[in-house]
Amino acid sequence: SQRAMRLQARVMAMKFHGMRLMSATTSGEDSPLPRLIVKLQTCELNYQLSALAVDVLGELGLLLPDSAEVRSHGTWPRRNMFDIGMIIGGGTAQIQKNIIAERGLGLPREPKLALGESKDKHGL
């Protein structure tokens, strides 16, 4: 499927990006920006891979591990939930993107709203 092929391309890109990071580190060119990007991309990619596995397994992949019909002993649904937790536990994707923008790219901090102030005139 197209989804699987896109994920395969992302896995290969991450592999080569990791090699580039190792090479930069060993040659003394270490920079925080690539490491921040890898952290964000790895969490999201792991989640997308486990979500694909859950989708491929279908409804039988969601059964409890002790059920007679369960596929893969419930490994992929557990992995999928773990990956969601890693995204949340490591800081939400938006927070990670803000860190990359501020620390890695030197962009100004996102403005904070004053107490009681809303984002727009409709209060959304």
What are these regions (language model features)?
Residues 1-124:
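Alpha-helical interface subdomain recognition
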